Curated annotation (Swiss-Prot):
Gene: SUE1
Residue range covered by the transit peptide: 1-24
A Pfam family this chain is assigned to: Pet20
Name the record gives this protein: Protein SUE1, mitochondrial
Subcellular location: Mitochondrion envelope
SS bond list: none
Position of the signal peptide: none
Function, as annotated: Required for degradation of unstable forms of cytochrome c.
GO terms (BP aspect): protein catabolic process
One cellular component term from this protein's GO annotations in UniProt: mitochondrial envelope
Domain of life: Eukaryota
InterPro entries in UniProt: Pet20-like
Keywords: Mitochondrion, Transit peptide
Length: 206
């Protein structure tokens, strides 16, 4: 609706055109209110995030966006995680009792104690390194590295798929004599594939 009002101000007649668009005013006012509310909410959220979620002190790490599932599963399988059983740490509550017992044994018979000590050392070595010095399920891991750092030795990488067990607890020294270029070409054993090859060879023979 357009209404024309004619008024006289100080003897001067001025025509004022007042545009009254009711539909427009009804729509504009709530939109402005909504916009103001949204801006207030956003500003409050920004302040909250800046106050509570400040990640600037955290170190930067490479992105995990382009990781492949196969590589992840392979790394998890060969990463060498296992339940830690050996070596068992000495309980400080029983140190004095052990020292007293050792002193009494030394006074009674030094020779027998020395022999027992050498046997204990051998057992300790077997526990850490295994009987052959190559680790094992009852040992501390690959060549005893589980005692200090739970990783496969560098000399066995990247061919540890063949030269070590799946959990990296035992390595097989006979694989050291195999050249790396031959190990690269190796593939896991597939019984079905071998059966197909034998079947084809039999057909050719016929």
């Amino acid at each position: 609706m357009i209404l024309l009002k004619r008024t006289k101000i100080r003897g001067v007649s001025v025509s004022f055109v007042s545009l009254q668009r009711r539909t427009h005013s009804r729509l504009v006012n709530p939109i402005r209110q909504q916009h103001q509310q949204i801006t207030k909410q956003r500003s409050s959220k920004i302040l909250k995030n800046a106050h509570f979620y400040d990640f600037r002190s955290l170190p930067k790490v490479p992105t995990t966006q382009y990781l492949e599932a196969r590589e992840l599963t392979r790394d998890i399988l060969y990463s060498g995680y296992r339940p830690v059983m050996y070596p068992v740490k000495e309980n400080p509550l029983f140190r004095d009792k052990k020292r007293k017992s050792l002193q009494t044994l030394l006074t009674m018979n030094e020779k027998t104690n020395a022999e027992a000590k050498t046997i204990d050392e051998k057992k300790h070595k077997n526990i850490l390194f295994g009987e052959r010095g190559t680790g094992g399920i009852m040992s501390g891991g690959v060549n005893g590295t589980w005692k200090y750092n739970p990783t496969v030795p560098n000399e066995l990488l990247p061919f540890n798929w063949w030269s070590t067990s799946s959990m990296g607890m035992e390595y097989f020294p006979e694989w050291k004599n195999v050249p790396p270029y031959m190990m690269r070409k190796l593939k896991p054993f597939d019984k079905a594939l071998q059966m197909r090859l034998t079947h084809k060879s039999k057909k050719k023979m016929k």
